[in-house]
């Protein structure tokens, strides 16, 4: 007899993802990913001035803040042939690296670590033994017996109160929690440290972008003025603060995040380096231009595609080509003028809503019909995984440094083969390794910015194309970026300085989309197939694999038998 687990919503932060998984014989045999909230931003920005669009589309997500604004200004700049000043490029890179550091660290600790860490077990730990172990792993100054004891006492009072708050509804005591009490205490202490740390690193966004979340951008560069000696500009004191926060972030990542990641990976590697691989194709648009955005070879993150996990070849990708990227709606609640089986390149994309699903509230979706608000993108008819793992795999296949050396070093430390990358654990580790590189890149770009300023170059924007007497009848462009969660593309079509069409193909579109008309699964659905479930009432294994994609999720799980009959409800954090 099979059971169907319904996870809806799969994230409280954004609240728009539902997963239905069929379990048979203790293993997931089928899975369906459904976006349950329609995204209307693309229609909202129609007929607006393209120079204003970044401020609207940036609000599509408050978690990976700023990256949609960056993709939007890049799309307009691409359409109009605008080249931004080197200083603006450096500032954009710094802000993006800060986003990576913040997002990956918060994901690991606040959104994913508790899938591996048993907080209740930490209450049984010996703080002295935990501190000694932590000191062996890292020179982090807070790894002391006194600090661990004090934090454990706080946790005990928290639990004794009966109000667990953020730790409520966990699967504490689940047999697949494998860390020792001391390891659990280390990770829990650092979980709380990460909460404090994350509010500091985003001050860099406030300096350069005016605020966080949703810092300011401008078509042609950045809207901030830098003058080392001017009190009302970003001066030497403000830049000193930026450097301080970047250095603090690097220390936290290298002395807390990475050691904890390796500690956890060592415990779970035998099982979880073989589970959750999913699709076998990986896409990266590349990002972090060292020079001009058009000089793709200079990117810190390379562009390309790896097919069928073949690390001997990287295939080129052209987002402008109508023969490469298309979006399909066969299982999505939209309609195309050419019919449900048509595939459209985003320049020709349509956003016509057509909900045909059950009237809420409902128990199960009709997965043979349309079942999601997410379209299904394909590259030459192939599904792709995007995100930190995809970026790392493309870089590794390309022989790009430092990615290749860091991956090889980590695999040696964990005594794992390269194939271990294609897994839930590999996906989780990729975020941490990328975070480590982002910390180095941020300081590298900062030092280059300072050098430019010292050489007398203070330009922050190219306003030559800001105003024209006569706007062209037709312009189009694409803004490519690598968001923390993966490949991001904004496509814009402009007629006489007004947006005619705007389409966003975002990381979640690639990863969380429904299967195509041929029944080929996308990343989320595919990664769940074959996952063993110890206890359907506590489906910890599902959380581990889905969380590894970083959808910022917290779930409410309902169980049904094969006929859709209600069996049990499980609340998760």
Could you say what each language-model-derived stretch is?
Residues 1-573:
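Metal/cofactor-centered catalytic core regions of large enzymes
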């Amino acid at each position: 007899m099979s059971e169907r687990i319904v996870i809806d919503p799969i994230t409280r932060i954004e609240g728009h993802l539902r997963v239905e998984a069929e379990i048979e014989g203790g293993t997931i045999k089928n899975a369906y990913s459904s976006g349950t909230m329609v995204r209307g931003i693309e229609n909202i920005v129609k007929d607006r001035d393209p120079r204003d669009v970044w401020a609207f589309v940036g609000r599509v997500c408050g978690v990976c803040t700023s990256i949609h604004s960056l993709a939007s200004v890049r799309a307009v700049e691409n359409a109009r042939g605008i080249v931004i000043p080197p200083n603006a490029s450096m500032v954009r890179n710094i802000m993006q690296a800060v986003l990576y550091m913040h997002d990956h660290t918060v994901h690991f600790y606040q959104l994913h670590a508790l899938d591996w860490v048993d907080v209740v077990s930490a209450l049984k730990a010996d703080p002295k033994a935990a501190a000694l172990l932590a000191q062996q792993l890292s020179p982090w100054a807070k790894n002391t017996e006194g600090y661990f004891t004090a934090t454990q006492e706080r946790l005990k009072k928290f639990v004794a109160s009966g109000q667990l708050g953020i730790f409520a509804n966990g699967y504490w005591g689940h047999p697949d929690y494998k860390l020792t009490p001391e390891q659990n205490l280390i990770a829990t202490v650092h979980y709380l440290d990460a909460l404090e740390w994350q509010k500091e690193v985003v001050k860099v966004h406030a300096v350069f972008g005016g605020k966080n979340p949703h810092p300011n951008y401008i078509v042609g560069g950045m809207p901030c003025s830098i003058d080392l000696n001017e009190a009302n500009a970003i001066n030497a004191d403000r830049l000193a603060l930026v450097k301080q926060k970047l250095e603090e972030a690097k220390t936290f990542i290298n002395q807390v995040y990475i050691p904890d990641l390796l500690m956890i990976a060592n415990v779970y590697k035998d099982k979880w380096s073989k589970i959750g691989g999913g699709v076998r194709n990986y896409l990266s648009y590349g990002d972090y231009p060292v020079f001009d955005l058009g000089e793709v070879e200079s990117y810190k993150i390379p562009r390309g595609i790896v097919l069928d996990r073949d690390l001997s070849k990287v295939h080129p990708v052209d987002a402008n080509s109508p023969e490469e990227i298309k979006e399909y709606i066969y299982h999505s609640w939209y309609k195309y003028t050419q019919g449900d089986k048509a595939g459209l390149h985003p320049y020709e994309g349509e956003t016509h809503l057509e909900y045909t699903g059950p009237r809420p509230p409902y128990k199960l979706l009709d997965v043979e019909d349309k079942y999601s608000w997410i379209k299904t993108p394909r590259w030459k008819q192939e599904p792709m995984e995007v995100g930190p793992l995809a970026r790392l795999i493309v870089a590794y296949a390309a022989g790009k440094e430092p990615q290749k050396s860091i991956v090889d070093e980590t695999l040696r430390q964990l005594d794992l083969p390269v194939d271990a990358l294609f897994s839930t654990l590999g996906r989780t580790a990729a975020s941490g390794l990328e975070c480590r590189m982002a910390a180095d890149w941020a300081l590298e770009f900062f030092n280059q910015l300072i050098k430019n300023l010292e050489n007398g170059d203070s330009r922050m924007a190219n306003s030559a194309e800001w105003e024209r007497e006569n706007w062209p009848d037709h312009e189009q462009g694409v803004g490519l970026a690598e968001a923390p969660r993966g490949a991001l593309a904004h496509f814009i079509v402009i007629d006489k300085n007004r947006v005619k069409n705007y389409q966003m193909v975002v990381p979640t579109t690639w990863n969380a989309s429904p299967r195509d008309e041929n029944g080929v699964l996308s990343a989320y659905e595919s990664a769940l197939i074959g996952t063993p479930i110890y206890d359907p009432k506590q489906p910890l294994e599902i959380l581990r694999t889905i969380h590894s994609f970083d959808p910022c999720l917290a779930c409410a799980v309902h169980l049904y038998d094969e006929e859709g009959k209600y069996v049990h409800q499980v609340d998760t954090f």
